[in-house]
Design a protein with these regions (language model features):
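Short, amphipathic alpha-helical segments
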Residues: 98, 102, 122-126, 144-155
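Short, hydrophobic-biased segments on the C-terminal half of alpha helices
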Residues: 59, 63, 154-159
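A contiguous catalytic/ligand-binding core that recognizes phosphate-bearing ligands
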Residues: 107-123, 129, 142-144
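Amphipathic alpha-helical interaction surfaces
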Residues: 114, 134-138, 160
Length: 161
């Protein structure tokens, strides 16, 4: 059985609500990530970001969340895009982000919900940092992460919630 490690992929894109909605509008069933990139780039919809950033959003965020291993999430979300309220759509994006990012999923299930169930109303930066430190020292990352990476990922985890 292959061991799945935590990665830093989450830092490639937080939120991305508007970008995801726009990409869902551009995406067609059967498109590869490269085809989606070319279509999105040609559309001019993403003129406020570089082509490299658009490619990263598609490859590191959109595809893992909504296209892999199969494009069923993108198919469903495309049908719901702009037709359900923003809060509900954000919750669906949240779920697919957690499914694609193991560290985020575990943060939610092992820390966020435990604290919420215990009556806490907020998490601190230190709570998030300790979670990431335990993960790196506990063998959940392929390599030990630098202090900068730990700080950045801790902040990202907290900001999504």
């Amino acid at each position: 059985m292959e061991h799945t490690y935590y990665t830093t992929q989450l830092q490639a894109g937080l939120g991305l609500i508007e970008e995801t909605q726009l990409l869902l509008s551009e995406w067609q069933f059967g498109m590869s990530t490269q085809e989606l990139f070319q279509t999105a780039l040609a559309s001019g919809t993403f003129s406020n970001i570089t082509a490299r950033r658009l490619r990263n959003i598609i490859a590191e965020c959109f595809a893992p969340r909504y296209l892999n291993p199969k494009p069923q999430p993108a198919t469903w979300l495309r049908q719901l895009n702009y037709s359900i309220n923003a809060s509900s759509l954000k919750q669906l994006f949240f779920i697919y982000t957690a499914r694609a990012n193991l560290i985020f999923r575990d943060f939610i299930t092992e820390l966020y919900w435990e604290r919420y169930a215990a009556g806490y109303t907020e998490l601190s930066n230190e709570d998030s940092r300790e979670f990431v430190l335990r993960a790196t020292s506990g063998g959940k990352t392929k390599n030990l992460w630098s202090d900068t990476t730990i700080k950045r990922l801790s902040s990202y985890l907290l900001s999504i919630c």
